[in-house]
Each structure stands twice: as C-alpha cells, then as structure tokens.
Curated annotation (Swiss-Prot):
Coiled coil: none annotated. NCBIfam families: PRK05473.1 (NF003997). Belongs to the UPF0297 family. Disulfide bonds: none annotated. It comes from Lactobacillus acidophilus (strain ATCC 700396 / NCK56 / N2 / NCFM). This is UPF0297 protein LBA0418. Pfam families: IreB (PF06135). It comes from the Bacteria. InterPro entries: IreB (IPR009309). The lineage of its organism: Bacteria, Bacillati, Bacillota, Bacilli, Lactobacillales.
Amino acid sequence: MSSLDKTMHFDFNQNKGKNVYDTLQDVYNALEEKGYNPINQIVGYLLSGDPAYIPRHNDARNLILKHERDEIIEELVKSYLGKNK
C-alpha cells in the first residue's frame, strides 16, 4: 500500500505552539514594557478584533493572532470561574 492510499491524521492542537495562558502572559509583559495599560489593550483587541491594540514588540501581535479571539475569551471565562478542565 503506497503512502497515497493511507489516510493521514492531523491533530490541530499538536501544532498550536503556546497555549493561551502563556500567550497572554507574553502579550501582557510586552504591553507593560511599552508603557501601555495591558488590560485595556487586551480588552480593546478582544472586543474589536483590531490587532493594532497589540504592539509588535517581542512579537506580541503575532503571538496573539495565533489564537482565535473566541478561544481566548473561552479560556479567560474558564479561568475566572475556576473551570480549567
């Protein structure tokens, strides 16, 4: 059987890289280093979807764009409610 006849398995989560928590920590630190209010900037990004709220400093913008906004919000709600399962 050739490799073209085999079904490949793709695991989306395996290729994600950093988890949401680590990404938010890095973005928060980058915003602080640039003198911004990190909470306001992250909330602005999550509400608007405009990546201009996140600086390119320390690759923060590219890091946060690797996650969907709804995924970030879901993780924040789970964390807030203590439902990190």
